[in-house]
Amino acid sequence: HLSIRRQRQMCIRDREYTGALFVFTKCDAEDYQAFVLNSEEDIDQFLDAFGISPTETNQLIDAGRVQEETQERIAIQEFIAGLTVDFPLSEEMSAAARDIQNRVYDHLEFIRTNPDRKIIDWTNTEYALFRAIEHARYGDAIARGFTSVDEFITMANMVLNRRKSRAGKSLEHHLSAIFDGNEIIYTAQAVTEGNKKPDFIFPSQASYHDMTFPTERLISLAAKTTCKDRWRQVINEADRLRDRPKYLCTLQQGISPAQMDEMQSENVILVVPRQYITSYPADRQDRIWTLSKFVSYVREVEGL
């Protein structure tokens, strides 16, 4: 290790160090260490190891965040190393992502106190996990290249179809975990009239089909990662609730004013993580429910 004074002289006076990465770390109250990484390979390895993008240099690094993200990558690689199949089932993938996120970042209390943040955190971890598995399974094949256009298309279709399938189920799995953590009673993929299947019926499928059960105590929720065009599917998923609000949880950031007006006319209420609501038309944001508000509403209706 070089002294701070020597490092400063080297970085300022020697042109060969222009563009080098200077890393200055605090060891304790009195001692510091400084490093100069001058090759692209060394710089890339450092940034990759700590999950730092090139745009995040020239500033203080949150050591706690770096440590957590490094732990997350290690946990993901350990999970992949233990797999006995190419890709786990969607439910297993989501559960693994929640387990990794909960272990690394903690804050299990957010399931109750801040479900809006928790569901985004789980979703982000699952996305990172899925990408890591894709890289482990397909990285070498892609690096080698393809012998024909057909071979490339076959690979691309396989990857895209798996991505679509995972994304469609991921939100449902994480919502189930939020509901379980809040002791909410529900049936996932309940069967209603004409074999229709809303994603969630509260409190249960049995209650829905019990004509003596009060309609005002029934709630339906659809889960769609994106809903720009498919939101109309939720309108007729439960005949008993045709004149009641239909709730639609989505991770889509932003919908046009015209579509929001159409949703309102069909009595569809959007449920969106709080962090995403600002991406919606400002004069219509008051129509949107946060996930926290929806959870509180269901708990109230169920008398919890």
Q: Locations of the language-model features?
A:
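Short peripheral tails and domain-boundary helices/loops at the edges of structured domains
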Residues: 40-83
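Single conserved hydrophobic/aromatic residue that forms the stacking wall/gate
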Residues: 1-4, 8, 12
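Interdomain/boundary linker segments immediately adjacent to catalytic/signaling cores
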Residues: 79-169
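Domain-level recognition of nuclease-like catalytic cores that cleave nucleotide substrates
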Residues: 31, 36-43, 253-304
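Loop/turn positions that initiate beta-strands
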Residues: 18-20
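A short acidic, amphipathic alpha-helical/loop segment
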Residues: 233-240, 259-262
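Acidic-basic catalytic patches of nuclease active cores, encompassing PD-(D/E)XK
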Residues: 148-196
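Conserved catalytic cores of phosphodiester-cleaving nucleases, focusing on short active-site segments
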Residues: 179, 200-225, 234-236
